[in-house]
């Protein structure tokens, strides 16, 4: 959540260190929980995205949203694609040529990524998986009744507490 707020408020964009992954059986409400994060503005969330970092349209679609849920990550990315995904999600900016533009433009990243998976063994990367922060979900309540605007205000307050920027993992957390 801190990464989401940093993506929204950091003027120079933000390089996120990883993505939160909910792993659990089908039908628990993992995607619905992510949808609740931006329930007050549906245009801020892209749910069930299939992202191809090599495809400009896929990238443009993803980074046009504040929060992107990569649905069913294990079926979207092959083992060879995971390194590209890790590099993409941690990038601070995106270089794109929009339709009808003559030149490429560098856009500061304003997007935070989340993912959901069903199978526990979706990570098969021998080089390490520190970019994927996995939470095993056995039960989740997407209808929790929490005021999401208030929640985001509190997250922002925590992020910029006394002028500090606290969204990066500490050495111990890595």
Pin down the residues of each PLM region.
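P-loop NTPase catalytic core of nucleic-acid-dependent motor ATPases
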Residues: 1-63, 67
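Feature primarily recognizes SF3-like P-loop helicase cores of small DNA viruses
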Residues: 13-18, 45-46, 54-70, 76-89, ...
């Amino acid at each position: 959540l801190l990464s989401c707020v940093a993506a929204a408020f950091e003027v120079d964009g933000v390089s996120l260190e990883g993505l939160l992954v909910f792993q659990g059986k089908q039908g628990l409400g993992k995607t619905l929980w992510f949808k609740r994060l931006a329930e007050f503005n549906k245009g801020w969330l892209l749910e069930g995205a299939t992202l191809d970092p090599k495809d400009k349209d896929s990238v443009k679609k993803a980074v046009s949203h504040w929060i992107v849920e990569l649905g069913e990550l294990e079926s979207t990315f092959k083992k060879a694609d995971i390194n590209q995904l890790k590099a993409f999600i941690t990038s601070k900016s995106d270089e794109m040529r929009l339709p009808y533009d003559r030149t490429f433009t560098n856009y500061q990243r304003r997007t935070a990524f989340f993912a959901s998976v069903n199978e526990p063994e979706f990570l098969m990367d021998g080089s390490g998986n520190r970019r994927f922060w996995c939470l095993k979900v056995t039960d989740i309540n997407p209808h929790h009744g929490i005021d999401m605007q208030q929640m985001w205000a509190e997250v922002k307050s925590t992020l910029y507490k006394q002028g500090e920027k606290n969204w990066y993992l500490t050495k111990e957390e890595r």
